[in-house]
UniProtKB/Swiss-Prot annotation:
Coiled coil: none annotated. Changing residue 104 to D/E/V/I/G/P: Decrease in inhibition. Its main location: secreted. Residues 1-25 are annotated as: Disordered. Residues 1-12 have a biased composition (Low complexity). InterPro entries: Prot_inh_I16_SSI, Prot_inh_SSI_I16_CS, Subtilisin_inhibitor, Subtilisin_inhibitor-like_sf. GO terms for cellular component: extracellular region. Homodimer. Disulfide bonds join 66-81, 102-132. The record marks 104-105 as: Reactive bond for subtilisin. Belongs to the protease inhibitor I16 (SSI) family. Changing residue 104 to K/R: Also inhibits trypsin. It comes from Streptomyces albogriseolus. This is Subtilisin inhibitor.
Length: 144
């Protein structure tokens, strides 16, 4: 019999939703759960010429993930994560290296950092007088 939409359709017996087979995560055994949960730490760092995020086009961008372990496109993810952990994720606490000499040339670069550090949102923007000054601050975090 074909259902044309006119009149009652033939009754079809279906199992109740609770009797449906389990799949995916529902099949996972309790022992398969992660041993410990962690707060995410994942950042996107960009750098571009200029003094304002509205006018400076990003020239380079990297990703930096520090939890559960260092990864991302940052060239020194391990040391950058260690440097951030040492200051509790406070980007303002990253200090300038004393042994770095930079030229006194004004060619401003804008650094932005957005993402999450240990579960808390991060939005950081800073203008450096030139790229050497940016690299001198923040040790390996800003060196990309």
């Amino acid at each position: 019999m074909r259902n044309t939409g006119a009149g009652p359709s033939p009754s079809v017996s279906r199992p109740p939703p609770s009797a449906a087979p389990l799949s995916g995560a529902a099949l996972a055994a309790p022992g398969d759960a992660p041993s410990a949960l962690y707060a995410p730490s994942a950042l996107v760092l960009t750098v571009g010429k200029g003094v304002s995020a509205t006018t400076a086009a990003p020239e380079r961008a990297v990703t930096l993930t520090c939890a559960p372990g260092p990864s991302g496109t940052h060239p020194a993810a391990g040391s950058a994560c260690a440097d951030l952990a040492a200051v509790g994720g406070d980007l303002n606490a990253l200090t300038r290296g004393e042994d770095v000499m930079c030229p006194m040339v004004y060619d401003p670069v804008l650094l932005t950092v957005d993402g999450v550090w240990q579960g808390k949102r991060v939005s950081y923007e800073r203008v450096f007088s030139n790229e050497c000054e940016m690299n001198a601050h923040g040790s390996s975090v800003f060196a990309f």
